[in-house]
Amino acid sequence: MNATENFQIIHRYLARQHVLTLCTATGDDVWCANCFYVFNADEIAFWFMTELHTRHGEMMQVNPQVAGTIAGQIRHIAQIKGIQFKGEVIRLEGEKDKVARARYCRRFPVSIAVKTPIWQLNLNEIKMTDNTLGFGKKICWQR
């Protein structure tokens, strides 16, 4: 497969999922949190909401370098698909916030009522495991 075909496989998977595990770190402290997300294929980024005062929110303000995973709960090993990623987060403001928030609220209507900050996680590296393409098949992408 070429790079375009690889990215299309990753894109399809990310567009069908909706929860990521976000891993943050500052100094010798690490923390993970599950967040609902929308995949922005144009910027190869995730949009997600989280408060500034959460443990991971505070850590992202100190160190915007993050990593994480996306995985379904598959019972059969031959069907395993999942993503490992790393990237950098920024808190959105102004017009970018409005655009991301509108799309996020369309996907998750319950979020319309909250004023939680919205963040963009710019993906720098993705590694996907897709056992439906062959046991242990890896598809990699880098910015």
UniProtKB/Swiss-Prot annotation:
NCBIfam families: PRK03467.1 (NF002900). This is UPF0306 protein plu4501. It comes from Photorhabdus laumondii subsp. laumondii (strain DSM 15139 / CIP 105565 / TT01) (Photorhabdus luminescens subsp. laumondii). It comes from the Bacteria. Belongs to the UPF0306 family. InterPro entries: Split_barrel_FMN-bd, UPF0306.
